[in-house]
Amino acid sequence: MKIVIQRVKEASVSIDGKIAGAIDQGLLLLVGIGPDDQAEDIDYAVRKISHMRIFSDPEGKMNRSIQDIEGSVLSISQFTLYADTKKGNRPAFTGAAKPDRASQLYNSFNAQLEQLVPVQRGVFGADMQVSLINDGPVTIILDTKYR
């Protein structure tokens, strides 16, 4: 799994002009599923994201987690994180998991994360418009293959 984690003041996702999900302070996650991803990758990602201390404490140090601040998550499926740009000018996305498998793992990831923090989500495979106000900005890339 490749996940772009962005600390946000607020974020929302719209489909066909209608808001499908929105959060106030929390994390915007762009979630890509690879062909070799398994339940262990989900476990690792959920544990890391829910405990990652990237929110400021009263002294201004990044010392608090999404759980500590009682924030929310907006989760967006993002197969383009597996783009291969080696040849030509048009990215290839053959490195991403097949849609059926990716959808299953993405839904499992969200369900597991939702046991720890409130989760809003986009619609898998839909054309979405994402709006956000970055906080910091703080942007972290988590790749479950490098643990």
UniProtKB/Swiss-Prot annotation:
The keyword RNA-binding applies. It is found in: Cytoplasm. GO terms for molecular function: D-tyrosyl-tRNA(Tyr) deacylase activity; Gly-tRNA(Ala) deacylase activity; Ser(Gly)-tRNA(Ala) hydrolase activity; tRNA binding. One of its GO terms (biological process) is D-amino acid catabolic process. It catalyses: glycyl-tRNA(Ala) + H2O = tRNA(Ala) + glycine + H(+); a D-aminoacyl-tRNA + H2O = a tRNA + a D-alpha-amino acid + H(+). It is an enzyme of class 3 (hydrolase). NCBIfam families: D-aminoacyl-tRNA deacylase. A Gly-cisPro motif from one monomer fits into the active site of the other monomer to allow specific chiral rejection of L-amino acids. Belongs to the DTD family. Homodimer. This is D-aminoacyl-tRNA deacylase. The gene is dtd.
